[in-house]
Amino acid sequence: MCIRDSVNSFYKPFFFRHVETFLDSPQPVAEYIPLKHFLHRFTRSIFWELEDMIPFSNHPLYRCLWGWLGAPEVSLLKLVQGPVIRRSSVYAHVVQESIMPIRRLPEGIRKFDDWFGAYPLLVFPVRIFNRGEHSGMLKPRPEECEPPNRTSGLWVDLGAYGVPRDVKQGQVWDAKSSVRAMEHWTRDAGGFQALYTDIFCTPLELREMFDFTLMDAARKRLGGDDAFPEVYDKVRSEDGISDLSVELAAEKAAGKTVDGKKGK
């Protein structure tokens, strides 16, 4: 029997906690989830991070009395954080996603355990289409697309959210080296990083991950170079979060530039 379950109602348990109950269920259970509730199944709990902010947020009393308020707006939380608290949170907390070809998922899970050790992990399938020169910033490698036409391929979004294992064990977690290792592996695997997260790559490294051909052409045609910031300037972490002076100096010494221009 399939029952209807509006999992995103404010008084309901968080979706990931609801899913956990099925692990102990002796019988198979089928549910029908309305589309809007399914698409927003992680919204109320900010995936599973709200319990780190408000430990009792999944308590029935809290859900019934204050659940209708919804989750705090993350952008506003960042806005009111001072630079010291903001930097401390980055180096004691992980929010990262790597979108990799699905065949690399087993390796990605093992590496996420090495880099972050934060659980549970989010796993989302993503289909990426190969439109050739019109693909935009997400230009998949043809060998990762499905034969015979190679018009699209299946990637998977692997996400880690929470407190890294090293931090829980009272050790120092090197956020910069861990995230940069993830970024390097993602680029080599033909994947992409979610740019809402704290990035630790240089402008050149970002361009190696994403295809800026159409973006650069549009900026040049419309005169946007002098009017609007680069993509990197819009998504990079604030000053004081990461020091990339060594990496930028190494790129400069090696003569590496961004499309023939001096690296930023």
What are these regions (language model features)?
Residues 4-264:
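Noncatalytic alpha-helical scaffold of FAD-dependent oxidoreductases
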